[in-house]
Amino acid sequence: MLVRGRDQGSGSRLGPIVRRWAPRPSPLQSLAASLDAEPSSAAVPDGFPAGPTVSPRRLARPPGLEEALSALGLQGEREYAGDIFAEVMVCRVLPLRALPRAVTPEMRALVVDWLVQVHEYLGLAGDTLYLAVHLLDSYLSAGRVRLHRLQLLGVACLFVACKMEECVLPEPAFLCLLSADSFSRAELLRAERRILSRLDFRLHHPGPLLCLGLLAALAGSSPQVMLLATYFLELSLLEAEAAGWEPGRRAAAALSLAHRLLDGAGSRLQPELYRCSLGGGSVWGHRSFRDLPSWSFLRSRRMRDNY
């Protein structure tokens, strides 16, 4: 549960996280099971195990890729369209069980939900939020973290993501103010250094939001479908198992679900587009949509209000 402080002048402050975690069913469990991800125990130099990946060599360039990049404002990268597509669609992901034992999925969801509020309050770019959550999951998978420092860790990850994605950075003191002074500016900067050290400065991550834009442009999706798919993609941030999905599969699942809801049960993306973007395999498998109604009961009312 999240609380807000009383209004101070013309603005309001976001209050600290209240430690109340209630178990809830995972609304994306059926989708996660259908992604056919295989666990991997291979180690990588930055200290945490690599998740399942699909080799970029298996990706075929879909027709209309150059036009899709142009629609996203990437005209200068047309020469490298195939390499860009392979890089953003398939990259290393985190293992499905990446959380420390002391951190439950409900605790993580609470921190991410609070970060969504801070992200909206500051008016940050969408890629900043996805990168912040990725850094949070990477840090949690790399080692232990104290429970009373989860909020500090989340804010520090958002601060690092702002340095990667934003032109104007929020002041560290203002981030502390939004947290109701739960930690000091010096503690925030120390947390930033710990993140950089533990992750070995591996901060770049092509998030699923770019993949969604590419797939929507390739499929010719309507703005309504794109908006609904973006909502589903943002809801997946609350799910810890979503960190184990390749960005391309994650975006394709959200886009296909949006098409099915708005265009009818028989509507879905072209199978050849899936094969090009995911290197084979199936997004849906043989799972039904029996968990679909639970999406509307997620406790993140902030996300529903945003869309």
From Swiss-Prot:
Biological process terms in GO annotation: G1/S transition of mitotic cell cycle
Keywords for the protein's UniProt record, in alphabetical order: Nucleus
Gene3D superfamilies named among the record's database cross-references: Cyclin-like
Annotated region described as Disordered, given as residue ranges: 1-21, 35-60
One matching Pfam family: Cyclin_N
GO CC annotations, alphabetized: cyclin-dependent protein kinase holoenzyme complex; cytoplasm; nucleus
Chain ranges of the Cyclin N-terminal domain: 102-203
GO molecular function: cyclin-dependent protein serine/threonine kinase regulator activity
Major location (coarse): nucleus
Compartmental location: Nucleus
Summary of the tissues where the protein is detected: Expression is induced in lung and colon cancer cells.
Functional description taken from the UniProt entry: Seems to be involved in the regulation of proliferation and migration.
PANTHER family: CYCLINS
Protein name: Cyclin-P
